[in-house]
Every structure is written in C-alpha cells, then in structure tokens.
Amino acid sequence: MGALSLASSTFAQTWIWYPGDYEIWLGNQMNNRRTERGAFFPPFWKTDSHYVVVEFSKQLNLSEPEEIFIAAEGKYNVKLDGKLQFGMPETMTLPAGKHSLNIKVWNQATPPTIYVKGKTVNSDSSWRVTYEDKEWIDESGKASDTSATVYMDAGCWNFDGATQRPSQFTLLREPHQAISKTEQPEGGTLYDFGKETFGYITLKNLSGKGHIAIFYGESPEEAKDKEFCETLDKLFVESGQVTDLAIRSTSPLNDSANEYTLENSKAFRYVYITHEPGVQIGEVSMQYEYLPEEYRGSFRCNDEELNRIWEVSAYTMHLTTREFFIDGIKRDRWVWSGDAIQSYLMNYYLFFDNESVKRTIWLLRGKDPVTSHSNTIMDYTFYWFLSVYDYYMYSGDRHFVNQLYLRMQTMMDYVLGRTNKNGMVEGLSGDWVFVDWADGYLDKKGELSFEQILFCRSLETMALCADLIGDSDGKQKYDKLASALKAKLKPTFWNTQKQAFVHNSVNGRQSDAVTRYANMFSVFFQYLDDKKQAFCPFKRQYPEDYHSLYAFL
C-alpha cells in the first residue's frame, strides 16, 4: 500500500477519481513540504482542494448476471437503476440486462476514489464522474432528471490493485551510505554522500538524552555554516524516543538497532551533525527517495567531458522528476509553471513520461474560479497554455485536451478580462511580471513584447484545442483574437533600425532596449518572415540550430 510500481497498467480495473482532484491533492502534499531553516513555508498562491462528494456512474449491458467487488476511499452508497442498496456493499450481484450503476463517495480528507472489479464491469477511465449530480426528489417521490449535470471521464493513473489505495502512494526508497565520515576540529561530524541526492537521514544506535542538530549543504562549507545554510533539522532524544522539534512530532526508536529516520526529506550532498554530550549516535545513513523512470533517451560521443555533462544533466532531471516536475530539490521544491515547461520538453527526450506531465499540468491549473495567474506570474500562465500545446504535439493525446478544455477556457477568460484597450496584457495589481532573473534593471512597465508573443501563442493554442474537441465557435473566437494581436506586434514593437523587437512600449512609445526574450520566441514561433528572421539578433547568433534550442530553454 506504500510505494507502487509505475509501469503501465496491465489490468482491466484501476482506482478512479474526479479528473484533476487526485493530482491537486497530491500536489498539496508536496508543495507544503518546503521549509526555510526549519520553518514551515507553504505556497503563496491560491491552494485548491478536491471535491469532497463525487458520483461515479456507468451504463451497463450484461449478457449474464455478474458479481462485482467494490472498494472506496470514503463513505459511499450504491444505486442500481436508481434504487439505493443497503449499507456500503463490498460485493453485489448485477442482473443480466441494461442497468445504471451509480456509486457516490464522500471523503473530506482525501479525494473520493473507487475500485470496482468484476468479469466485465471494472472501474476505468470510461466511467463518468461529477461533483454535483443535481438529482433531487419531489414531494411525490419522483427523482429529477440529471440533464443539467456536467459529467467528465474519470481520472486514473496506475493503482491497479484493490490494496493500492491512491491516498497511500509514496515514492520509492532505497538505503544509501555516506562515502566518508570526518570528525571536525570544532566538534561535530561531516558526512559526504558522494553526490547531490534527496531523501531522509537515518540515525542508528541512537541513545542517551539531549539535542541533535543536522545541517545540510551542497558543499562542506555550506553544511558547516550553521547560521546561514538553507536547510537544517533539530531533534531531541529522551527515553527511547525522538522529537522532531520543527514539526513537533515524537516517535519511538525502531527495533533493536535504536534507529530513527526523519519524517522530512531534504536535498544535500554533505550533512554536518552536532549533538550534546549526553547523546550517542552510531551510524548515519540515508533513504534515497525517487520516482522510478525508464530512460528512453541516451547520448554518447567521443568527448568524455560532454558525456559526463549529459550524465549529470540526466541525473539532475531525474532528481527533479518526483510526484510532479519541480523547480529544484533543495529549497522551493514547488511546482512552478516556468520550470515545469522546461522539464516537460526535456522529459519528452529522456523519459517520455506523459503521466508526470499530465499530473503537473492538472496541478498548475487548479480549479475555478481563477483569481490570479499561475504561481501569480503572468508569463507562467502563458507557459501553462504552451505546455498543453507541446504535450499534444508530442503525444497526440486528444482525450487529455478534451478533459482539460473547460479549465483552459476559464483560464483564458481570466486573461482576456485583464487586457488593456489595445487588447494587450500588462502587469496589473497582484501580477508578478517575471520574464527572467536578469542581471541589472529589467523594465516591467507597460506592454512587454515578450508577454504579447506568449499571449498570442496561447490564443493560438486555444484555437488548436477548440478545433480538436469540435468547438467551432471557440476556434473562430480564438483565431480572431490571435490574428488581431499578432497583427499589432510589429507595429508596436518592431524597430526597423535595430531589426529587432524592442523590450516594451509605455503609453504608446517604444523603448530603446532590445532584450533576447521576445526575439527568441518570435523565431521559435515563426512570427517573423524569412527576411526579418535573418536580421533578428537571436537568429544571427544561432543561425543553424535555433529550432532545436527550444527543447532546452
């Protein structure tokens, strides 16, 4: 019931849930593990949650009676052809013929999920789900129709056994030993685990009474900098039990080895441990935590340094591929849309793990109502739209687009509601206009050419997705908006003398600054004709390989 195999499903049945709900719930678990020097540090953007009541339904046509097994995470009822069954049946026999099977689950703590197994009746993504069936019963006892109910296809991953409950999912772990242990002249012990890693420190043969301090670092200097290292833990040992002082959690020592593993994971190479004289620590090791992945991409050449760069890059990518694609293992460990879109592109060549891409896209979108940009950052909202475009182009997964489309529409409605009189976006109150961690001053005022180009591509993405799901009115709407915005890009931002897009326009006046951002993406998206591309400063710098560079931005 803990860590599960992540191979593709080979079973007919699987645990199912409302699409996006499990991903949002799981993401909340991960995003709220961040600490700043022992202090809990939750995200500063809106945190959504799962629907607490979900109905699962399936239309059946059975050639013979069939017994089914039912499991659920939550309190549930079962209706067959509109009639409630007694209690919460674990098994029931369905008669032959056409029937409607409905299972409604309530769970306040974790997403409502179900697992149904029979000869032909099995829970999978073909089941329909809703968070409000809108079925009421009038004074005569007649039930209303549910024609106003919005149903979705069920969400699932690969929890294919009855005991593989989604809420119990954890990443895999394996024990790793430090490659060296060095007593320090100023006191304490420095442990080197050989390379950057991620997991949980384990203390063995732990006894006595007193405080233990654990400091983490990418270098010996950082780990030993007790006042300024990014991450640390503090423990108190007494009477065969350990209290983690950061999270106020007390646990007994495990088994005869008097072993204790910290509950909070950390990223590190070096670990520096000090303790009071009354405490004895035997061995220090770690439990390495990871998402198992199949390496589908590889690289090898006659330059060993380049080979090593590839190996380190692939390992780094794997470290940040966890329940979701995260920005980095050390500090934030959050899901940021700008970091995620880069991870998606690298993933398509290294792992081609589409499930992790979809989980991350669901989490970053969250739920309605939309009250801010993704991660509060304007450009990150547009990266979110672009990530859907890229995912479809690499996977051809039309079903995912169909599932996500309503939330794409409401996200774009939010953006369109914040455009100015020119139909362009500019930073408003509450918006973080990010662009880049740039050296020196980077003007964020007015209409930024970079933001308009991302906005235009997002509108084109909406038109593509509308066409994929058969929304002809939507396609016409978004095509018109994209064309109108695209037609304004050159008149507003193109500087003939510089042969480039300038950085921004304030009150209708072009700035003198030329930055790489708009010019790069205009080349990637082929928004410039051949002549302008030839003169574009970015194209001049990368004349041959500019298209391939997009995969690694």
What are these model-derived regions, one by one?
Residues V335-L553:
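Active-site core of glycosidic bond-cleaving carbohydrate-active enzymes
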Residues M1-Q13:
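Bacterial Sec-dependent N-terminal signal peptides
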Residues A3, K75, Q108, K209-G210, ...:
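Generic hydrophobic alpha-helical segments
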Residues F11-E323, D339, E355-T360, H399, ...:
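Extracellular/oxidizing-compartment recognition motifs
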Residues V53-E55, G87, Q184-E186, I329, ...:
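Short, solvent-exposed coil/turn segments
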Residues T320-G328, D368:
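Short amphipathic alpha-helical segments and their helix-coil junctions
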Residues I329-R331, V335:
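Glycine/proline-enriched, intrinsically flexible loops and inter-domain linkers
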